[in-house]
Amino acid sequence: MVHVNPIVKSFEYGQHTVTLETGVIARQADAAVLASMGDTTVLVTVVGKKFEEPGRDFFPLTVNYQEKTYAAGKIPGGFFKREGRPSESETLIARLIDRPIRPLFPNGFKNEVQVIITVVSVDPEINPDVISMIGTSAALAISGLPFNGPLGVARVGYTDGEYVLNPNVSQLVDSDLDLIVAGTQGAVLMVESEAAALPEEVMLGGVVYGHDQQQVVISAINELKAEASKPAWDWTAPVQDADLVAKIKDLAEAEMAAAYQIEVKQDRYTQVGVVKSAAKEALLAENPEADLREIDGLLGSLEKQVVRSRIIAGNPRIDGREPDMVRGLNVMAGVLPRTHGSALFTRGETQALVTCTLGTERDAQKVDSIMGEYTNRFMLHYNFPPYSVGETGFVGSPKRREIGHGKLAWRGINAVMPSAEEFPYSVRVVSEITESNGSSSMASVCGTSLALMDAGVPIKTSVAGIAMGLVKEGDDFVVLSDILGDEDHLGDMDFKVAGTRDGITALQMDIKIEGINKEIMQIALQQAYGARVHILNVMDQAIGEHRDDISDHAPRITTLKINPEKIRDVIGKGGATIRALTEETGTTIELEDDGTVKIASANGDATKEAIRRIEEITAEVEVGTIYNGKVVRIVDFGAFVTILPGKDGLVHISQIAEERVANVSDYLQVGQEVKVKVMEVDRQGRVRLSMKEAAPKAEAAPAE
């Protein structure tokens, strides 16, 4: 019998108990942790390659997050009945885990590391994202890899003016905030949130609250590490060649500084490439055996130093702006003739062409996940083609980054979207990034707000987004508004804020260094507010409120109510009636259990015809009313006449004419149209009709 020795740590976290266990499962991995929060359990494994591949100039960290349907007691759909490619939710959670752990690996570490998180049990009330992040932090902490953790994680809600630690799924429905914050003992590293237009101070308070509360997570992981950690890897950061650093500085510093005063991105990149090539040629001429990878790395470090030192010294930014300035804006709405709504939003060298398409409830996205089934009426898709940065590349299914940016923009807009009762349409927005030089996701937020208004979607108010950056050297720091791509790459923080004039709807923060304190975040939020209001003012000049009507090319949804008992009549046997209705009128018809009927069509006449026919089908037969009917069957004792769709009545032979009728066929033929009067509807729903009573009465003869 194999002897196993589990090491377990448990602690209370909000209203849930968190358990971390190692030593039983997946013992051949460098580290494996079974992490549980309530009944939601994930298995996290970490494996790192012991040797670095020659020639590699990046850190190959891979995070794979996978939700197994057996965790929820389900069998996968589809022909093969097994899990397939990652869903959007799995991709987003993988990114959520990756972002805070990546900066905790030391510079120069380039060994391949793979983290696999497998959801093996799920409580529909407890989302696996936070416990997956906690489990990943614990597994990395005990793996022996050079990881500067552990990392703490907390979800924060905000209900009735109070912060809530680790709210469950039901509690989040009534919460004005859904915020996840991750950080080390002394610093916040990542924030991801969605909010109902909350003030800056409430958002900042949520970040601080979450960071304070997650210290219990860090303590528990440290205890686990003390008992279960593998031996630390014998890895040391590569030592820089001081002579080579000095030579590169002499060769390229002045030229690099000059290149970074070129404001046009493509021209600047070309000149930076020229400077680097010249430096490499000079160094290789001096020493043909020089390590090109090392030279490239040192040139990159010099590039970073040149840009950062200028900003810290108070010099103008790369494109000549002051720290709090927003690039020039160009905003247009209604730029495409046949789309339901469109906008072109340009900020400096970043541009988004955004379209809005309206559809019926049938067009909504139906999602079946391990957390349950739900429907998305509002979809936002972000595309980043290679031409947007002047490159060639693969065009196909969306990458992780595109999915993540689309979701961030969705969070920024979702708080102002109308309810289904206010606007019974499904809405799909697509943001095509046509130019990119920093903060394309926030350009998507601005463009989406404009396109929705152009489409006539009654959003509550305009929404704008802005990306903030940071350069910090020692105690000196500069917060930058509307960062360029270079400032994002070479800076210490990417801080994206979307919101209205009243508050923040989405906040995403990724920090690459330790030491970001409350003061810096406060300054960034205040600066972001000023930039956001400036952008909103420009947007409102293009279109300040939603159009009064939707596009002529959009389907118009007309709603009517019928008796719920009549739904089966509208559907017909095997769906024949509703199928004929939709095909013959060219409309889309949706029925709800409460008797609500939604008819969608871009053609008003088609809608009217569909309404008329549905009203006919669902109309009640009224005693005493005269109908234009059609003979459908003749029998010896009379004729059956259709007076409404699906409703026949009997004209008895005695009710066909005033005179005595011997043979019904002498008076009536199948298909003949006749006027009939409803005489009676019995308890069984049988209708008695009369042609005699429907005929005009002869005028009384005058008295003699």
Curated annotation (Swiss-Prot):
One Gene Ontology term from the biological process aspect of the record: RNA processing
Disulfide cross-links: none
Any one cellular-component term (Gene Ontology): cytosol
Main location as per UniProt: cytoplasm
Location of the KH domain: 555-614
Subcellular location: Cytoplasm
Keyword Ribonucleoprotein set for record: no
Residue stretches making up the S1 motif domain: 624-692
Subunit structure: Component of the RNA degradosome, which is a multiprotein complex involved in RNA processing and mRNA degradation.
PROSITE patterns listed in its UniProt record: KH_TYPE_1, S1
Protein name: Polyribonucleotide nucleotidyltransferase
This enzyme's EC code(s): 2.7.7.8
Keywords from the named record: Cytoplasm, Magnesium, Metal-binding, Nucleotidyltransferase, RNA-binding, Transferase
UniProt similarity note: Belongs to the polyribonucleotide nucleotidyltransferase family.
Cofactor(s) required, per the database record: Mg(2+)
Pfam families from the UniProt entry: KH_1, PNPase, RNase_PH, RNase_PH_C, S1
Enzyme class per UniProt: transferase
